[in-house]
């Protein structure tokens, strides 16, 4: 009943809403009123509801109890959540928000106050590839003027991950906040590594700090930095040790600005693989996704490998010019050992340049080259040479001249198209020294193979053997037995 003092007896309310993109919900309130008017009297109620949250393909429900007594509204119990949240390849299982302390809103004209504490709990969060975030809990407290202006503080835990400390404020239009991730061991993030990677995180520490804001017209924006120190990860076929990674970033309007005052920095002490690489450095700065107006630039790439060094001064995306990879003093003996070639052995160093294209209709590498830095040697494996001579009598004499050769000059042209077809054209000049006999050798070698198949099979030595068998010709003999060979004038 309704009197001059307000509503007495049972009081109910039902709220329904629907929005095309966000979804729909229905909320019921049912309780007992006693001389109730807004900010006067008392209305005790329980509430419940349900709905759908379309952007994340989720069903929503809520229930709880509370009261409105004079100018104070109190939520004494609350349980609300989703059956799941799905966004892209991420799936959060059964997230639920409950009260740690009652939420109390004092609607006083001179001294309004909003207080309370909540806990957001979720079961496992899964990602593509089988990686996951363990069951997590975010506990936070509210303190402010009213639901349109309050501050919050809290912390996020996910088993050994965290705590990530949070603080911020809501002013009715914009949510602003900060998150601090204190330094902790890299090993606690093992669940986030997909099992198919077979990667074991062993050492290192990680810490981060992020500031963020969100508003209806602005969307979500964030900026901050993350730091990885002394990281180490082992896999069945390789080890990565001594990783230092610094990531300053901003995110706005769907774009990442990587590197603000300083570029993103990657330093790796050692990569142990079929080829061991050491002292890798690389810097990255720019926008992702990139555009002509806002490019992304990789710079100052350097790594020590195969007794020499590989460098790349700059790679700009979108790409206007090829990025020049320089090879300096690469050991041919270390290279042939790394790819496990048994048919021949080489010694000596080579240098070269590989113009790299990532945005080209035809080429990945075009007009690359290699040359010898000084004297080199080529020695055919005895069993390989003997087998070639036995199987091909006409080529046998030529093969014998190539059993051991000192190379004075070599030049190799390298092309790799975007279908993976690698083309090598080599010109080699040198002296054959076999059984005390010296002869000048001019060898032209051409080879073509899909490099993806080559990486899988590592059959380079077998292919060279087949080419020698089919193309070897007898070198011109320039001297008599036992005498030093000389070029004719």
Predicted regions mapped to residue ranges:
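Short beta-strand segments enriched in hydrophobic/aromatic residues
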Residues: 214, 358, 372, 428-430
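Active-site proximal loops enriched in glycine and acidic residues that flank catalytic Cys/His/Asp
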Residues: 247, 314, 367-372, 416-418, ...
């Amino acid at each position: 009943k309704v009197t001059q003092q307000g509503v007495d007896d049972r009081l109910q309310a039902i709220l329904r809403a629907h929005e095309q993109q966000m979804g729909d919900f229905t909320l019921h309130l049912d309780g007992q009123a006693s001389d109730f008017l807004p900010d006067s009297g008392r209305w005790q109620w329980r509430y419940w509801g349900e709905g759908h949250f379309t952007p994340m393909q989720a069903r929503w429900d809520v229930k709880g109890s509370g009261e409105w007594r004079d100018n104070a509204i109190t939520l004494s119990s609350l349980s609300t959540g989703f059956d799941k949240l799905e966004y892209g390849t991420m799936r959060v299982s059964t997230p639920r928000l409950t009260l740690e302390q009652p939420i109390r809103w004092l609607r006083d004209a001179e001294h309004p106050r909003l207080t309370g504490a909540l806990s957001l709990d979720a079961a496992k969060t899964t990602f593509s590839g089988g990686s996951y975030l363990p069951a997590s809990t975010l506990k936070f407290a509210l303190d402010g003027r009213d639901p349109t202006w309050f501050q919050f503080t809290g912390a996020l835990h996910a088993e050994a991950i965290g705590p990530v400390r949070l603080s911020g404020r809501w002013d009715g239009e914009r949510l602003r906040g900060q998150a601090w991730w204190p330094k902790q061991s890299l090993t606690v993030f093992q669940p986030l590594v997909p099992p198919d990677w077979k990667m074991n995180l062993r050492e290192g520490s990680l810490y981060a700090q992020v500031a963020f804001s969100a508003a209806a017209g602005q969307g979500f924006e964030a900026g901050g930095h993350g730091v990885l120190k002394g990281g180490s990860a082992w896999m069945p076929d390789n080890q990565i040790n001594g990783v230092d990674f610094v990531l300053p970033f901003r995110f706005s309007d769907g774009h990442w600005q990587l590197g603000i005052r300083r570029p993103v920095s990657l330093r790796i002490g050692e990569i142990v693989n079929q080829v061991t690489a050491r002292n890798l450095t690389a810097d990255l700065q720019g926008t992702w996704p990139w555009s002509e107006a806002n490019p992304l630039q990789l710079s100052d790439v350097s790594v020590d490998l195969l007794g020499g060094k590989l460098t790349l001064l700059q790679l700009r995306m979108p790409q206007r010019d090829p990025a020049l990879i320089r090879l300096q003093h690469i050991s041919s003996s270390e290279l042939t050992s790394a790819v496990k070639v048994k048919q021949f052995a080489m010694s000596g160093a080579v240098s070269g340049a590989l113009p790299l294209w990532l945005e080209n209709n035809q080429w990945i590498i075009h007009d690359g080259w290699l040359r010898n830095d000084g004297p080199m040697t080529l020695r055919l494996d005895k069993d390989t040479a003997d087998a070639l001579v036995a199987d091909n009598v006409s080529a046998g004499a030529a093969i014998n001249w190539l059993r051991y050769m000192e190379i004075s000059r070599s030049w190799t042209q390298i092309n790799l198209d975007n279908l993976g077809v690698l083309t090598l054209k080599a010109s080699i000049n040198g002296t054959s020294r076999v059984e005390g006999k010296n002869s000048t050798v001019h060898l032209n070698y051409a080879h073509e193979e899909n490099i993806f198949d080559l990486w899988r099979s590592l059959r380079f030595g077998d292919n060279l053997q087949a080419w020698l068998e089919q193309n070897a010709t007898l070198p011109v003999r320039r001297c008599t037995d036992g005498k030093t060979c000389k070029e004719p004038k």
